[in-house]
């Protein structure tokens, strides 16, 4: 499983586009640029929550605090909301929920540990129950509990680019934009960006760190075409540099 804290392989991306189109993706900052995927597909602020153990435990605590009627509503929501790897969110959270229900986890100890921690989320969520409710509400409102799950589905990668971008002024009309993304081509971002371009304006190249060829994406009759060249299992690092 490719988790939120796992160090990824990188995908190297290069876009060549008109400067007027690049402005939809880039933000000038002093003498450089920031590339923010939120300009194309904004992530709701409520999803800016930690993923991992604190998520699982806080959802379990919130569920534990509810009466039987509310528990059923939450269980139905979690069970009917699909997610990769676990298939649905009930499968993801049910282990900790069951450990609370059978007494192998102590709810008061967990709550006190959260209260005495320096977790940054305490600034917004004063108790572990409030935090768990936020995760559940996010699933209800957005289909995902946290930034990681939402970005993987909507952007196609887990991290933003920000200032880790190179912008080359090719000529008076065009930029070359280079940046890396975690694990894969940011597929959702690529598709959204392609909507800004006419067929002859769209040009996106990418290479995966585990090298499966040089990919050049173009647009023909509104459809994205992936042209792959240079695939060779016996590659070296200098052969995969864009």
Task: Please identify what each model-predicted range represents.
Residues 3-242:
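Long, contiguous binding/interaction regions
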């Amino acid at each position: 499983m490719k988790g939120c804290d796992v160090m990824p392989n990188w995908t190297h991306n290069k876009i060549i586009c008109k400067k007027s189109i690049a402005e939809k993706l880039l933000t000038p900052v002093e003498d450089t640029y920031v590339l923010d995927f939120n300009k194309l597909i904004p992530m709701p602020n409520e999803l800016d929550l930690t993923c991992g153990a604190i998520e699982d435990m806080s959802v379990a605590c919130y569920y534990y605090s509810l009466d039987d009627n509310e528990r059923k509503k939450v269980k139905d929501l979690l069970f009917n909301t699909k997610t990769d790897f676990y298939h649905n969110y009930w499968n993801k959270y049910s282990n900790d929920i069951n450990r609370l229900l059978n007494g192998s986890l102590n709810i008061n100890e967990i709550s006190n540990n959260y209260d005495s921690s320096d977790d940054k989320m305490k600034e917004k969520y004063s108790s572990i129950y409030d935090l768990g409710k936020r995760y559940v509400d996010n699933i209800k409102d957005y289909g995902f509990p946290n930034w990681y799950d939402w970005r993987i589905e909507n952007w196609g990668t887990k991290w933003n680019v920000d200032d880790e971008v190179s912008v080359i002024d090719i000529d008076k009309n065009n930029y070359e934009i280079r940046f890396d993304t975690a694990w894969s081509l940011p597929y959702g971002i690529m598709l959204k960006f392609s909507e800004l371009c006419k067929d002859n304006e769209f040009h996106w190249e990418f290479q995966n760190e585990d090298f499966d060829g040089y990919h050049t994406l173009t647009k023909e009759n509104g459809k994205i075409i992936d042209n792959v060249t240079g695939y060779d299992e016996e590659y070296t690092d200098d052969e995969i540099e864009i």
